[in-house]
Amino acid sequence: MANSERTNGLQETNQRYGPLQEQVPKVGNQAVGPIEIFRFADNLDIVLMTLGILASMINGATVPLMSLVLGEISDHLINGCLVQTNRTKYQNCSQTQEKLNEDIIVLTLYYIGIGAAALIFGYVQISFWVITAARQTTRIRKQFFHSILAQDISWFDGSDICELNTRMTGDINKLCDGIGDKIPLMFQNISGFSIGLVISLIKSWKLSLVVLSTSPLIMASSALCSRMIISLTSKELDAYSKAGAVAEEALSSIQTVTAFGAQEKEIQRYTQHLKDAKDAGIKRATASKLSLGAVYFFMNGAYGLAFWYGTSLIFGGEPGYTIGTILAVFFSVIHSSYCIGSVAPHLETFTVARGAAFNIFQVIDKKPNIDNFSTAGFVPECIEGNIEFKNVSFSYPSRPSAKVLKGLNLKIKAGETVALVGPSGSGKSTTVQLLQRLYDPEDGCITVDENDIRAQNVRHYREQIGVVRQEPVLFGTTIGNNIKFGREGVGEKEMEQAAREANAYDFIMAFPKKFNTLVGEKGAQMSGGQKQRIAIARALVRNPKILILDEATSALDTESESLVQTALEKASKGRTTIVVAHRLSTIRGADLIVTMKDGMVVEKGTHAELMAKQGLYYSLAMAQDIKKVDEQMESRTCSTAGNASYGSLCDVNSAKAPCTDQLEEAVHHQKTSLPEVSLLKIFKLSKSEWPFVVLGTLASALNGSVHPVFSIIFGKLVTMFEDKNKATLKQDAELYSMMLVVLGIVALVTYLMQGLFYGRAEENLAMRLRHSAFKAMLYQDMAWYDDKENNTGALTTTLAVDVAQIQGAATSRLGIVTQDVSNMSLSILISFIYGWEMTLLILSFAPVLAVTGMIQTAAMAGFANRDKQALKRAGKIATEAVENIRTVVSLTRERAFEQMYEETLQTQHRNALKRAHITGCCYAVSHAFVHFAHAAGFRFGAYLIQAGRMMPEGMFIVFTAIAYGAMAIGETLVWAPEYSKAKAGASHLFALLKNKPTINSCSQSGEKPDTCEGNLEFREVSFVYPCRPEVPVLQNMSLSIEKGKTVAFVGSSGCGKSTCVQLLQRFYDPMKGQVLLDGVDVKELNVQWLRSQTAIVSQEPVLFNCSIAENIAYGDNSRMVPLEEIKEVADAANIHSFIEGLPRKYNTLVGLRGVQLSGGQKQRLAIARALLRKPKILLLDEATSALDNESEKVVQQALDKARRGKTCLVVAHRLSTIQNADMIVVLQNGSIKEQGTHQELLRNGDTYFKLVAAH
């Protein structure tokens, strides 16, 4: 048997999925082209983008044109000043003070015209691009989700589903940032650079060429750093995707994580990927700032060279060179260099977006072999259900050399019920998957009514098939909607009828909200039996021509199993039904039983015929004692089996049900009324990184002083030409030129320091916040997870989006703001020193800018909150669909999920359109009023100079300083929306971190007894689930369990069996009464110690995306478990031989949720994991239900051996598995109806007797 198990298991795993190795996307310099990123723009988007670019280029020309006006004003003012102070020397000069006033007024009007252009085109460039970015991003989100849903199942076998969900949030957000308002700002700067360059060349090509001599160095350094940024960004995003995958896996399996005390292990897995992201992020930040610093260094060197050479030209007698010419060239070059520097952060955002787009577009461009949305193929008028497998051979795409099916030939007549049986790995599941056309055969064909299914329309064909799987999948909506997912356009009467046929109607109607009752995430609010019956109703409502049942009744309790089995048998009439069975007792009445082995049919016939042959089927049947079952069934009376007088064993209202309307409203209020978070509180988040933040802030402040100091040098340069001899002028030119070079060195060093210190601080903060948030999530109690707002999709979105918004605001954005504040403060101070009157006039425009900033900040904060909620809801829908893709595909409900996803995105899309206009208006006003302020300043400055109250030197210093200060204000306002988003994200993060769980799993308080014997007692326990306080689950239940005894809980679905187990694990605390362990209330015990004494094997085993050895070692997370010990428990669980037959043995990766393994293999790993824990209390919830016939007895024996000397609680539906229990407890209405041994209860002839008879 061991050899057979090893061979079959190896086939089931290797043949199906190939070598079990992790699918890790390769990382490199991967980014889409700068044009390709806009591939989802439609004609309107192209028009908007074109107009936006044109507007940004015109807007970019405003400052270079201003330099021309500045040059003219400079000549006029200098000449006017010379006329006024040297009247004797200039007595024959034609220029008079009146003429000067007229010229200044005309030039001021030019300034006002430039400001008006900036107002109009500034609004157009920003609003149009934000609009088109919102439109394209929404389209990309839809197309990305559509492409995922369109992929065939083989693609999902090789993809990390959790990473896909991370890309749907984090990567697309980065893409949106990169194609939004940063693009027109980049084009504005490019335009400013180009036009400034042209102006400088026209005014003085010699001087311009000297300045441009540094351009190759600038371009080379920028190109090198850009390549580094692309590569590092790709690595960073990849690491975050892997971290998101770990988080999603842990959060979606929180009960397993909590039960095994594995929170710290999951945190370590998560943190390891965060460390990789942090290392790449630090390098990326450093490279980005180094690039910016190099630009400023080379440009300042060019300025120094320009001034030195300019003075040489003037005093060398070159015609046409005046102070105005030099200033026009100089300011054009200055602005061009400023534009080059300003391009860098926007280019970085765009570069990051291109890297993110590569991953997104790669999925979008993937063409599936079987397109789930395809309209191709013919649609037959009707389907009878005649099925034939003609010489079908198949191997899974991931391992084409390993054949799973080898020339399978099988005919199934319409209306027949055919059962597929055989050991694990024989190809049963593969056969039904091929029939659903989840895969296509390599050789041969499958026909339905003599038509190759590949020639039929895939959606129409799948709509003719109903599937009920062993592990039912429900979606996080109402019971009614879950049933209606079975078929499009289902009416209320059809839904109710399907529920009746599935024996689900009564318990549904017992809920206060009936069919409108929410089932919770993954059906968490329903018991296993309730979930299965809803899934059966969903299949029946399809009215399928072909019905596939994969152990469809395995999760049902004893009372309803026979009723549902009867309903299924009735539903099978007139339909072709294929049953994949482990429990042969459920398929004795099949028209045809097909026994498979090694991908081929070895025998077929009726039950009686195959038993008579005494072949493989006979061996399987004998392993289950089916003969004994036959004899028992013959001795039972039909009246007992059919008697429904005993009714329901419990009020279904006691099932774990969703929250009431009032509670939902309270939860909604709580979510939408989060406290306001101040910027100071956000900054305090980075206090752990204070040395880096302080050094980075000092570097930013020093960097911010570069421009104000430059304004002083500039003013001195103007006065340098007033009545000075050549020798003095040459000395001054050399001095100021060297000072400009020094300023360039300061800029280089300070930018590099910002990258080093802020980069480290930002990535450390991001890692710490993600770590803290993930830890806070993992240590919440189960009641917190019952809240529908805390679903997996919403929580992973919080980790991916909120932290990203906070991290920059508290560190690198702080550096930019500090730099701008330093620039602005010093500029204003210098301006007051050199011309307080002119400064006051210009600053009178500041309130307009301040009000504009406040309006923008307030509006952005509101939009950020609404966007977050909308994206959370969208993330939940996407996560649910992708995680349960087989169910979605089988139900052909891809379009339904796509529609729900698109509807959710509409809120965010509408917000983006409103935000576009507000952002555009605020930017345009702030940008235009700078020009208006300049116009007023120059006119007033000319007046002050004429009045003798100010010198040209002071006016130019004030003008330059205020100009740089205004640019700093504008740059600060650009980042205002980022702070609004950060405040919104921080409010949610703080709420999470402050939420203290009622049951603190990480608490060190509580007793830790030296020994645990295992005596249990439920003393007058009453319990209601916190989210539904009006529905009692347990009512004054009292029960004593002696150490070492095996006690089984039986009863119908929802009567409190699982609740008892959860209370014992202290997932919840009773409302009244006590749960005692060795006479001590479990509330008094240390919760970690308590859970370390228990181990659970659930009906639906949860495995993690790591190796087999790591999954088994998950049973004991307090130590490093030796491999030998792992092998021992694997052998005890009858899984060791199978593992040893795998190429990588215990290092084999099991895939996401154990997808690389069969159900039986997963269950045996879960049993091994529980055995490793060496618990004093063993909790078994139908632990052998997923096992095939061949190994069920062996594993049951292993469990019988494992529970010796342990207190064992068994939650049972199949009564045959608990007949040897020391005590059987029958629950009804949340209390004990009767208890005793199997024989005692049979003699009583009460409820248990009737259950056995019905079974």
Swiss-Prot record:
GO terms for biological process: cell differentiation; eye development; regulation of membrane potential. Energy-dependent efflux transporter responsible for decreased drug accumulation in multidrug-resistant cells. Specifically present in limbal stem cells, where it plays a key role in corneal development and repair. Residues 387-623, 1016-1254 form the ABC transporter domain. This is ATP-binding cassette sub-family B member 5. It catalyses: daunorubicin(in) + ATP + H2O = daunorubicin(out) + ADP + phosphate + H(+). It is an enzyme of class 7 (translocase). Disruption phenotype: Defects in corneal development. While eyes contain all anterior and posterior segment components, corneas show developmental abnormalities characterized by decreased cellularity of the apical epithelial layer and disorganized basal and wing cell layers. Defects are due to depletion of quiescent limbal stem cells, leading to enhanced proliferation and apoptosis, and resulting in defective corneal differentiation and wound healing. The gene is Abcb5. It is a multi-pass membrane protein. Residues 51-351, 694-981 form the ABC transmembrane type-1 domain. The chain crosses the membrane at residues 46-66, 104-124, 290-310, 314-334, 694-714, 738-758, 814-836, 841-863, 955-975. It is found in: Cell membrane. Glycans are attached at N86, N92, N189, N372, N391, N643, N790, N1036, N1105, N1189, N1229. Coiled coil: none annotated. It comes from Mus musculus. Keywords: ATP-binding, Cell membrane, Differentiation, Glycoprotein, Membrane, Nucleotide-binding, Repeat, Translocase, Transmembrane, Transmembrane helix, Transport.
